[in-house]
Amino acid sequence: MNAVIASYLTQQPKPPLLKGAGVRWTPLHFNAEAPTEPAGETVGFCLQKRRKDSFVNYFVVNINYIIYKGYFMDILKQLENEFSLKAWQVKNTVELIDAGNTIPFIARYRKEATGSLDDQLLRELNDRLAYLRSLEEQKKKIISSITEQEKMTDEIALAIENAKTLTELEDIYRPFRPKRKTRASVAKALGLDGLAEKIYAQEKGTPSPEILAQEYITDEVPTVEDALQGARDIIAEQVSDDSQGRKLIRYAVKNHGVISVCGADEDLGVYENYAEYSESIKTIADHRVLAINRGEKESKLKVSIDFDKTIAFDLLYNIHCKGNNACTNEVITAVQDAYTRLIFPSIEREIRNELTDNACASSIKVFGENTRQLLMQPPVKGNVTIGLDPGYRTGCKVAVISETGKVLDTGVIYPAPPHNKIDEAKKIIKNLVKKHNVKMFAIGNGTASHETEVFAAEVIKELDCGITYMVVSEAGASVYSASKTAAEEFPQFDVSLRSAVSIARRLQDPLAELVKIDPKAIGVGQYQHDMPQKELSAALDGVVEACVNSVGVDLNTASPQLLSRVAGINSSIAKNIVLYREENGEFTSRSELKKVAKLGPKAFEQCAGFLRVAESKNVFDNTAVHPESYAAAKELLKICNVSESDIKTGNISLLKSQVETLGTSALAKQLDIGEPTLIDIVSELSKPGRDPRDELPKPLLRSDIMGIEDLKAGMELKGTVRNVIDFGAFVDIGVHQDGLVHISQITNKFIKHPSEMLKVGDIVTVWVLSVDAEKKRISLTMKKPK
């Protein structure tokens, strides 16, 4: 705070602004609750007004006052309550975030400080922290603005202090916000605000409005009706700006209003179900909100909110109609105008925006979870793979990929129409299989996929050597193949061949390949193109970051795109790591990272534990044990009589038995580390270089093919969940058209969302309910037929 103001404040008498029982003025000393100010310096007076069992604090500035409620500490308390956490957990977590630590680092290596909060909860807490800080900043701006206007009162100050959302703040600030030209502002400019005040007061004995209006007749206001209309316009705006009334109307509309939809076009197409549709605002599902919004955007639907205006009028009359005279009748007219012209259209927009925001947040969450499951699909390692990017006129692009993802061979075949060179294509593929000892085919699911799948199944049958295949999502492959990243990686290949390489690698290691693609292009969600792109990108980037750091990254083989997703590493540092690798050969230890340009101590601290160096002499370098814990890990091995060579060979039975005998609590104290860190160290040393994806069910590989025409009601099939959405899940059953398991067909028990039972990549048993071959619709159930 400015020293001049501080000096001025200390000399002021106790301001007589607020009086009453439970009010007292005391000198205010800044302390830890106001960390930005000098500790112990008296800079003003603090009003403490007893409210239940708490105090509300104000600072006084020039006899106007602003709130400075130690907001940092209040935010911590709010986070503590909202997330059901202990005070120390929130305090430590916020301090770690503010110190520039990444979420993956905090989740993995600061468990003692946070109480082992997981990555997802930390991200939610971080987002909420940002929102609450934004809210406090907005409060300060509003306080400053109202104070400058010399309109601050104790009621307004309390209302601002109590505001929990930006919407509440906007309601409070509405009367003080600089306005564009309105009917009310025009009336005020004509000097009619005095008339409006007299009419709104509705005092007994007040002359009739017509008599009152006579005093305001001028050249600009030639008639009594003109004067009364101007007064009503001023009152209407006053009613509209009243935060209490808006709050009541908003609550009533939210709880009793109805979304009404009707067709706006003769050909509604996919929106036929919404031709004459209505549903309570309280119960409408998120996916229906998004569907209706899209239909409205495409000019297929008209959407509105229906609400009984007589209820709204009664709510507003209770606030603004204080008498029962001629002036009251004018106020009633103004209230009705305020609701119809100003309040309801605003509330309608606000509620629809809120419904959309909530639906988008839900959809983004589903999209993120689906993306997480897709990225965490188990890799199919150790097999030479042929990637097939199907096509008709331009042919099917072929790429042979080694066990480590290196391109061994490429080509183009033409087994599909209009060429139909099936025999020639078979000969080429069989030669490639024999030449490179191919064990798997990865087939893109785009154009001509079905014909290519039939062709591949025939080749596999003729070879009869145990080859399997899988249809792989092409989503984003074309985006990647035409990108600068792909051009830098494969300058010698044309765009189409790069797609074939990407398809093969997606089967071998989905995570390593998919990180090269904008996660929005992966296409596992609902209405992703209708989402706020900034929020969607932030959420998906967080998911990708969490997945990459959960698995860990091989420092000597990772692409720049994969490295840039590691905690503490940006794209510039990632490129420098690859450049160092090219100039100096493979990394031989984690500590060698410190030699990379722009990778400073903080970046090293954040990233080191997530990077693996399999070739290092130090066994810990190929685990998730952080370098800061190496000394403790070595001491642990010494205590347990286990050598580093035992860890390398997997001879860890003695380590486990010794830890169990000695006890984690006693061992942690002896090693001077926390129990969570000790548990993680033991887990990592038990399986050095482990990949958490290996513990998940393997992808469903096939060797034969079925068509949609082969499906019959009641048929039992194995399938892979490809997408989970609000109303069900789409399952790949090997017929080129995913079937829908409606939420009602997932289980016999009640579930709110399909994600409670299913996730992308799950292998499930389903039964065919019905097939519409013409519309290519397959209905499935997971409930076993009786």
What are these regions (language model features)?
Residues 19-20, 32, 38:
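Glycine-biased, low-complexity coil/linker segments
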Residues 102-103, 118-185, 189-218, 550-695, ...:
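Accessory alpha-helical DNA-binding modules that contact the DNA backbone or grooves
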Residues 121-124, 131, 135-145, 149-387, ...:
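Duplex nucleic acid-engaging cores and interfaces of nucleic-acid transaction enzymes
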Residues 168, 470, 476, 481-551, ...:
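Long, charge-rich intrinsically disordered scaffolds of nucleic-acid metabolism proteins
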Residues 212-216, 220-224, 277-278, 309, ...:
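Low-complexity, acidic/Ser/Thr- and charged residue-rich accessory regions of DNA metabolism proteins
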Residues 350-368, 521-552, 669-713:
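Long, charged amphipathic helices and adjacent flexible linkers at domain junctions
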